[in-house]
């Protein structure tokens, strides 16, 4: 096996290839957590108090300056709950810098569905935008240097690709997506191998 030299473009491309399936899975899991173990909007008993044919219009506004991330997760939440019955109007794109009190997006659809999906959608937006915003802060501090900001595998379970995508939106770069991407010899590998030399030689041969 030939060791792979770090290539941020290859990491980014690999992430973008995986992300569609991971978005679907992550959203489904989050909705199941709210809806009694299955993706069924009828399990939101509070939303069922509203008239079935009622429709609403909602505007999501940011509370503070930052970097937006999470568009496709928001859309997937409502697609899984209501197919194409929710309409989106987007005022920002992933990676855009936003100001406090700026409208991010608007939703129009069944009132029950908007209320059922609201918290799940916002959880994704807040988490991913928070990561993107913090990454951008450090990237800006490093501007003018040759230093590149990389992420790690220390991510929330089930959200690996989402959080690494947020890093890209903030201007950072991805390191390893998983253990199969590249060798990374750390203290425990050295201890188990017997020496740094043995670990490195094994990686090359």
Task: Label the predicted regions.
Residues 2-205:
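Acidic/glycine-rich phosphate/pyrophosphate-binding loops and surrounding catalytic core
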